[in-house]
Curated annotation (Swiss-Prot):
Lineage summary: Bacteria, Pseudomonadati, Pseudomonadota, Betaproteobacteria, Burkholderiales
InterPro entries attached to this UniProt entry: EF-Ts_dimer_sf, Transl_elong_EFTs/EF1B, Transl_elong_EFTs/EF1B_dimer, Transl_elong_Ts_CS, UBA-like_sf
Segments for region (Involved in Mg(2+) ion dislocation from EF-Tu): 80-83
Subcellular location: Cytoplasm
Protein name: Elongation factor Ts
Main location: cytoplasm
UniProt record similarity statement: Belongs to the EF-Ts family.
Length: 298
């Protein structure tokens, strides 16, 4: 068997962008034949990535990049929380956020095509993603991102699972506090006037159904419904919420911002896996199915 040299490993890595250890294993299996090793490696990593690509990615991280008045936030998903803590996965997410801020891709496909190299993979971000899928054995995906430009920005990340970017004029410390508040209280808009009509209508429908059960006169029911809607609007609008750091427990975000001479133009809130239906494994059913299949084949 031919000796596996460092130069052979380096040559195979240059051709395939695969990790060095994978290159060495492939060369060993191919008994030093570079052509055969390259084929083995591409099949191995390609198959591994292909199997993972169909699996649900509901875990992951939120990454943000801010540079002056330019920035971006992105959600990058993985299958498990374990992989979301992987250094290579986190590095890819942070790099993706920076790429969004600096190069302004139109969508995920455009982002994926941008030049980027990491961990021996490249020359595009998509190649790095596929390489890490093959290396780690889990599906990964760039789910969504938003780019910010032309205004002051403040960001807050809570354990990498919740991310907030606030667009503002005024005091940076106050804006940072607002970002933290948004992460904790999850408002849906800056003011009650900005709450989406469909959310208001949904709340009105629920309130009407509850009020109707009271058996009170129609005019009283109407007032009850309106009262419930107004209460809801105060609960979900940033300006009307009680500031999480209020010393007296009463100061609203609007009052805090006025005192700080600061204006919040908007905010973006990302929560990892929000809206993604996670697969719940029923291990008892899986075992039962395997037993039944074994009996049928006997």
């Amino acid at each position: 068997m031919a000796a596996i040299t460092a130069s052979m490993v380096a040559e195979l890595r240059a051709k395939t962008d695969a990790p060095m250890m994978e290159c060495k294993k492939a060369l060993t299996e191919a008994e030093g034949d570079l052509v055969k090793a390259e084929e083995l490696l591409r099949v191995k990593l390609g198959t591994k990535a292909g199997k993972a690509a169909s699996r649900v990615t509901a875990e992951g991280v939120i990454a943000a990049f801010i540079n002056g008045n330019q920035g971006a936030m992105i959600e990058v998903n993985s299958e498990t929380d374990f992989v979301s803590k992987n250094d290579s996965f986190i590095a890819m997410a942070n790099a993706a956020a920076k790429l969004v801020a600096e190069q302004n891709p139109a969508d995920v496909a455009a982002l994926s095509a941008l030049a980027y190299e990491q961990d021996g993979f490249g020359p595009t971000l998509e190649d790095v993603r596929k390489g890490l899928i093959g290396k780690i054995g889990e599906n990964m995906s760039f789910r969504r991102f938003k780019r910010f430009d032309g205004t002051s920005l403040a960001s807050y990340l809570h354990g990498s699972r919740i991310g907030v970017v606030v667009e503002f004029d005024g005091d940076a410390t106050a804006a940072k506090d607002v970002a933290m508040h948004v992460a904790a209280m999850k408002p849906v808009s800056v003011t009650s006037a900005d709450v989406p009509a469909e959310l208001i209508e949904k709340e009105r429908t629920v309130a009407a159904a509850k009020a109707a059960e009271s058996g009170k006169p129609a005019e009283i029911v109407a007032k009850m419904v309106e009262g419930s809607v107004q209460k809801y609007l105060k609960e979900v609008s940033l300006a009307d919420q009680v500031f999480v750091k209020a010393a007296d427990g009463k100061q609203t975000v609007a009052q805090m911002l006025k005192a700080a001479n600061t204006n919040v133009k908007g905010f973006t809130l990302y929560v990892v896996g929000e809206g993604i239906e996670k697969k719940v494994d029923d291990f008892a059913a899986e075992v039962a199915a395997q037993v039944a299949a074994a009996k049928a084949g006997a």
